[in-house]
Structure formats: structure tokens, C-alpha cells
Amino acid sequence: MPYKISRAAYAGMFGPTTGDKVRLADTELFIEIEKDFTTYGEEVKFGGGKVIRDGMGQSQVTRADGAVDTVITNAVIVDHSGIYKADIGLKNGRIAAIGKAGNPDMQPGVNIIVGPGTEAIAGEGKIVTAGGMDSHIHFIAPQQIEEALMSGMTCMLGGGTGPAHGTLATTCTPGPWHIARMIEAADAFPMNLAFAGKGNASLPGALTEMVLAGATSLKLHEDWGTTPGAIDCCLSVADDYDVQVMIHTDTLNESGFVEDTIGAIKGRTIHAFHTEGAGGGHAPDIIKICGQPNVIPSSTNPTRPYTVNTIAEHLDMLMVCHHLSPSIPEDIAFAESRIRKETIAAEDILHDIGAFSIISSDSQAMGRVGEVAIRTWQTADKMKRQRGRLKEENGDNDNFRVRRYIAKYTINPAIAHGLSHEIGSVETGKRADLVLWNPAFFGVKPDMVLLGGSIAAAPMGDPNASIPTPQPVHYRPMFASYGKSLTNSSVTFVSQASLDAGLKGRLGVAKELVAVKNTRGGISKASMIHNDLTPEIEVDPETYDVRANGELLTCEPATVLPMAQRYFLF
């Protein structure tokens, strides 16, 4: 007769199982385990007196015959595809299998073979997510990369050359020479990186040479002149070479209004940055563009979520970022035209209903590179408190809302930028760029960050201590952040055209160069998982009130947020 164990005792030993609920950090978001792939009584666990021992949960199978390199045991997987419990097998830097690990010689249902060559990572009581992707990076300082990695990001896409004034304001790496230098620099960093060229030109020649130099995308920014002619030219080049276009539209409406921009886009796929408008764009109604079926709308994190401090901090932030002077009245008017509490409040709700698809940072250029995950989950929590459960929920949990929000910084930016064949989800065959979290610290402070199946970062105590836990415990780079392990554990994404033109041999970089694909007509707003709603948006030009399909979108600013000061006392 099988031995019976209480749910509490089981969760304490192997982690929660089907039907158990887990609170995410100090939010009001609760997930419920939908399925457990284990066989009860046959769970594998590492440690003294535990299961993964020779002749027990560990087989005699060699790596060549199918044993995995690493097994993550009994983890709760939180992904756009579902919330479930499983073992995860990693091999050759990729996710080899998800399911039941163990010794097939003596255990039933094993699809992940543990052998003498297998390392074990204890996932009991932990959450595993795909590494995050931040698709709005100003490469102002290389130190951003470590900050992002330690927050759970494993891919950064954007533009820049360092603290040049063009980079301080715009996410562009202009020209083939600068793109080459940035791709060369990428070899130094434990992070998957991708670079955007400048998209502002009325003739295609200069844009084409940037794509051939390795740009994965082209960025149209108003500070370089986002005119209808530049928009049309840039999208035409992107269509020719299968790269994405990101757009920051004309705040001052000098060369046209939002309707003119929509007309210049001509129904082609485009990623609209900070679509609410505080980060820049046609004032006051750029937010209308999120209802277009060809536009993939995103947010940058300073407006996430709307709080009592949002408006005040944005004015000073904007003056610095866009090289404006507080002594020039026109500059002050420019800044004030972009900061509107009505559209920021509406942005909260548009995220919650799935009309905004992506959340990113806008690093050091009106955005915080280490807070993409935090701001995403703070928005989700605020919306649950203010709007209640989503109608799509099934059962007494927040699973659908959690799946909607995690998609905003994992799978959806990966789809938008042609990287989803490699990253963006916990899925067999994809890169093993994974993040482990203690549920109490979910979204705030990771337990471990893996890049290409190797540990790149983790909190670690005093290296001279007798055990790993004594203070001071802080985030430190791990072995995948050093030497050839670094360049073998992460990649640099480039255009297919640049690979065809011999970029790898020309630059002689150590990292693998991987081509983006399917960024144009094969994707649209409908491709944004759990975030594909296209409501008709209206903005009152006098009051800035926002309506979606006739319904007024408004909410109160938050006065208190979770995942905030209590997590950062030290």
C-alpha cells in the first residue's frame, strides 16, 4: 500500500504539486500548479540520503548514450504556455527535455536520463522562468549589462555607442563602423546581445549598409527626424532584409500627426516604443496606435505602474535625457506635453486587457535596466487590486494574468524581433537561458541565472567562508561569465544578410552569431501571445481622456507598491 504524506510535508520535501498555490513575492498574485509531471513516489532529489545516487535515481548511462548535462529537479515552471511542475533536462546549452527525470533502468516514465555526468540543480520550492528579454536598450554604459543579468534578463536589444549624446537620447548604433565595434565588444559580456542601427534616412543606401554590418533592427527616433519619408524608407529596407523597425514618433507633430504616421507605415509590421507617449511620440494621442493590427505596442518601465510619484519624476528625467534646458520655455513646454496622467493611467489598463504587448526598460534614458521584471509584476498587482480577477481566469488563481504579464518580457519581444526560435520560453529545443526564483523574491531577486545551460550569476556569500551562505551575500558573476565559457554560453544576434556577407570572418569575434528571422509580414499584433487585443482608441485632445471601444480607461495612482522598499533594505 502506498505511503500517504500531507500536502504540507510533500511541498516541504519536493515543492508544491498539482492544486497547490504559490504567492508571488509580496503581491496579491497567486498561481496554482496546473499539472505535475512527476510520478508520485519516484521523484528525484539530490542530497545526502536522497534519490540521485548511483544505482538509485542516477543511472549508468553515458552522455553519449543520452544522459543530460544538467537536471533541474521538481521546479515550478511559470511560462506563457502554462504553470506546471516538472524536471528540466539541459544538454549542449539547450533545453533537452521537460518532464520526469531519473534512472530509466528502475524508474517508470523517465524522459530525462540522469547519469554520472549529470549535474543537479535543486528546483524544489523554486520557480523557473525563461530569461527575460529587454528590447529597449540604450547602450550608454557597459555596466548596465551586469545590472540586467542580475535582475533576470538574459537578452538585451537596442542601440548605442556609450555615453555619446546621440546614445543618451536614442537607441541607435549609427553606421557600419560603430556596429562593428559594438559586436566586437559583445564578446566581453555574459549576455545575449543584439544591436539596432539608425533608421532615420530618406534614401535606403545608408540603412542597407547598417543591416549588412549586422544590425538586427532599425530604430526611427524623433531626435533624428521621424518624418513620413524616413518611416517609409526604413520599413522598405526592413522588408527587403527581414529586420524589425522600432519607432519613436514626432512628439511636436512637426512633420505630421499620428494619422500621418499610420499612413506612412502602410500596414507594415512595426514595434512602437513607449506607445503611451511619456517616453516620446505624437502628443497627446500616440496611444491610439495600439489599436492598429500591424503595430506591436510596448511600454518602458518608468510609467509602470501609474503611481503618485510618476508625473513628478518624469519631468526632470525627460529634461536630462533629451538635452533640454529648464531656462528655455519651449523646452519646458516640450517636456510637459509628453507627461499626461490620463494616458499613463490608461496604459495600466491597456496592459491588463492585453492591448499593450511588451514591457522594456529604456535603460538610463528614461528607464531602469534592472527593473523590467519588477515593474511588470507591480503593474499586474496594481491591476488585480483595482480591477479584480480577469474574466479569462479558470479557478481561484491568477494564472492567466501571470501568463499574460510574463509574456510581456519573454516570448513577445522575442517574437517581435525574430528571436523566438532561440529564446523567450521554457521550451524543448530552445537555449537554456533560465532563471530560478525563490517565490518570496519572485521578480525581484533571482536565485540563479543560467546562460546557455551554465550558471552566469547568483547571490553568493563570503568566498572565504566555510560555506556559501555567510554575509556579505550579494550578486556575483559565476563561471559562465568568464573566459571561453562566456563566449560559448551567450550569442550575438545579427541579420541574416550580414552573415551571408561574411560578417563572422570579417570581425573574427568569438561568440556565435545567430540570425534573426520572421520579423516582417509573418508577424503582427496577432502574434503577441495573450497580448493581441486591438481596441479602437480615442483620446480627447482637451482633457487627454482615453477611451477603448467607447469605454473610459482610468484608474487611481498607486500610493504603495509591492516588490519595493522591503526588498532593498540592504
UniProtKB/Swiss-Prot annotation:
Q: Which cofactor does it need?
A: Ni cation
UniProt entry tagged with the keyword Kinase: no
Q: What CDD domains does the annotation carry? A: Urease_alpha
Superkingdom of origin: Bacteria
Q: Where is the active site?
A: 322 (proton donor)
Q: Which NCBIfam families match?
A: PRK13206.1, PRK13207.1, urease_alph
Which Gene Ontology cellular component annotation is one that this UniProt entry carries? cytoplasm
Cofactor, how bound (note): Binds 2 nickel ions per subunit.
Instruction: Give the free-text PTM comment from the record.
Output: Carboxylation allows a single lysine to coordinate two nickel ions.
Which species expresses this protein natively? Rhizobium etli (strain ATCC 51251 / DSM 11541 / JCM 21823 / NBRC 15573 / CFN 42)
Compartments where located: Cytoplasm
Which key words tag this protein in UniProt?
A: Cytoplasm, Hydrolase, Metal-binding, Nickel
User: Which family does the UniProt entry place this protein in?
Assistant: Belongs to the metallo-dependent hydrolases superfamily. Urease alpha subunit family.
**In the Enzyme Commission scheme, what number(s) does this protein have?**
3.5.1.5
Name used for this protein in its record:
Urease subunit alpha
Q: Which GO terms describe its biological process?
A: urea catabolic process
